[in-house]
């Protein structure tokens, strides 16, 4: 802050002293200070906002003190500017003028009226309607000697509120998978949590709070107050101490950010790990569930293919379902049966989707209505949405699917509330309450009377205009109104000599003068008084209506959840119909059988004349690890991802892209596919790879599905091969998990003879002269050719480099290299016998060459090193 608190502060203007007093209380927020028609910022805030939203940084006179930095924007444009600031991770406090400046005695009174943070916002300008916007908190406790991390997350716009307890080592994955907009931590833990997610999370604000807010006693107090109960046993969270503390922190933060109207948050539940398949962040990224690895956008993701929902509530739910597949067989079967019935009955499916399209985003509308941040138009739409419930209910109650029937039974039509909304809100209402006129005529007798008075008075004004024209002989005389000067008589400058003596001047314009007269003042007072009372009464009626809707929050929220699920099941059914998916059979054993499986995303983005190659996948007691060899671009990685996505879709409740699928329940899917440096954490490609591999070996069970692609390629050939071999042994002998292992190490195919459960497969190719055709078909057996040079040719390498690489490869395969390379200035046709040299270092250097990873240029450089080594011994 630029202002000093010594004697210099006495030189500040009264308004700036007021500003600094407020800023002191909200030091961590950008303070928007209302001055007339603008929101102004000062000192450091001004510089920050100027840079963040590209507005002019200027200076303001400050009495006898030096000028101060200032930046601002018009109040009517505030929503857009606040949205831009919050999306960039800033917290904003809005300080409004709470009295009329014309009536103020001294400095205008101002108060904080709104606080907006990334995790606490109701603004459509900030929110994405197809994403949840979570506010999360983390608390650390000890249960005995064991440290436990509690996490709670709340979406204030939908009232979804959940808690969980987990070991601290799982915290990063949980936070990043959840993707909260804002994370609350104790100030003493803030640096540690920021370090934990640095390099992984973008756009997440970490907010430090006072340590005293993280006490169990404090949590119990705020939770009991929120849910109006002496015990939390009814919510099933009484055993989760750390999670309850985190939930208490979330509610206290809502107090701090002035979110006092939160009675619509009616429930809290524990996230039970046993109900859901575990997908760590790496697996979600590698399988491209909600975003592509290429650019992080939804394009090319599983979500983009599967999301056929028609309602934002359904869109948010299908996103959650795909990231949290089920592990409970009965619940999965209920979803499959619901999808099947919607798939088999086009009439039912189309009727359901038509009804869903008429329903508004009830969750977010309810949150805005309950907090009085709504509009008449939104309340009217709430009534229209509730009115659709009976027809949707009637469609689904006769269904054969038990799940569809139970969802239909949840829908509560609330006819009394629908009637109350229809009686109260004018169907032609505007988008805001500012100008009134949104309460329907006949709703309230007093309001109708005030409107009648106002209407009659306005008719009298027209009479005054006619009378004054006759009296003065000025035919252009007009009685008009504006917000600043009220009602007035306007006379053009050409007619000023005809103005009667009784006219009182009100305003001078370039081409006219404005006057008033006693009769006009009397009716103005009557009109404005009636209009002011009308506006006030309309606001009271509207707030009472909003409160009436909020009283039904629990029922509306339950119906909203049912509607979201119906929408998601209908979306799955539409995908199954249009894409040709089959109903998977869920089994209790740990096998897996996929017949003619397809990759759900790749088959949608391929060219029409390029049919997708279908592949089978089979695991049972004898086949636990499929060792897949073959060249790059032959489809190994796609096959791994395809298998993982089919299992994920099945356990999410969807049909799957296959001719037939039997899925033994999977508790976790692990992926080790591709790698890159994590520079932010100082981790090399190989270290990242080994961290991921270690996590798999330490956490997988016999019920897991492991997808491994090129383990060990980040180090030397023999190191990598040894690690891959050892991992394979460990998985087979210790874990027994179903594993797909794609590798360039053809030597690993020997494991089929050594380890029961390992079975060789390969990605087939057809050779045509020096060219190869990748068939992308996975078949039984192994291969020992990677066709790396052919891939280099397809990538556009110069022909000279390709031919030289073939020459070098041919020599290496004969364990004899003969070459004449002018770039190394060696004697023409020099013959080198690599194994005549007695120096063992030469032999070791050759053995360490990783031929599968070397590019042609790198191969030449390695040969140059061998030459130099030879010369040193000649």
UniProtKB/Swiss-Prot annotation:
Pfam families: MutS_I, MutS_II, MutS_III, MutS_IV, MutS_V. SMART domains: MUTSac (SM00534), MUTSd (SM00533). GO terms for molecular function: ATP binding; ATP-dependent DNA damage sensor activity; damaged DNA binding; mismatched DNA binding. GO terms for cellular component: cytosol. InterPro entries: DNA_mismatch_repair_MutS (IPR005748), DNA_mismatch_repair_MutS-lik_N (IPR007695), DNA_mismatch_repair_MutS/MSH (IPR017261), DNA_mismatch_repair_MutS_C (IPR000432), DNA_mismatch_repair_MutS_clamp (IPR007861), DNA_mismatch_repair_MutS_core (IPR007696), DNA_mismatch_repair_MutS_N (IPR016151), DNA_mismatch_repair_MutS_sf (IPR036187). Keywords: ATP-binding, DNA damage, DNA repair, DNA-binding, Nucleotide-binding. PROSITE patterns: DNA_MISMATCH_REPAIR_2 (PS00486). GO terms for biological process: mismatch repair. NCBIfam families: mutS1, PRK05399.1. Belongs to the DNA mismatch repair MutS family. This is DNA mismatch repair protein MutS. The lineage of its organism: Bacteria, Pseudomonadati, Chlorobiota, Chlorobiia, Chlorobiales.
